[in-house]
Amino acid sequence: MKLTCVMIVAVLFLTAWTFVTADDSRNGLENLSPKARHEMKNPEASKSNKRYECYSTGTFCGVNGGLCCSNLCLFFVCLFS
């Protein structure tokens, strides 16, 4: 009986802890607005503006087609640059 009560209290505590420490998804877009505004003023601050070199046709691309200039990787080789 005591073990059952301890288990119930532990589950309730862990459930409450999960809700308390979880991110508030309702305000997620509000928190991104100041950052986006800052990135518009300073384009260098945006990580998405960084350009990475892409692989040309015939280059080994692994399984990630996003590394190819054409974004098309078939049998681990970039196609159509």
Swiss-Prot record:
As for subcellular location, the record says: Secreted
Q: Write out the function statement from the record.
A: Delta-conotoxins bind to site 6 of voltage-gated sodium channels (Nav) and inhibit the inactivation process.
Which residues, if any, are the signal sequence?
A: 1-22
Give the originating organism: Conus achatinus (Little frog cone)
Disulfide bridge map: 54-69, 61-73, 68-78
Protein's recorded name:
Delta-conotoxin-like Ac6.3
Keyword vocabulary terms for this entry: Cleavage on pair of basic residues, Disulfide bond, Ion channel impairing toxin, Knottin, Neurotoxin, Presynaptic neurotoxin, Secreted, Signal, Toxin, Voltage-gated sodium channel impairing toxin
Q: In which tissues is it expressed?
A: Expressed by the venom duct.
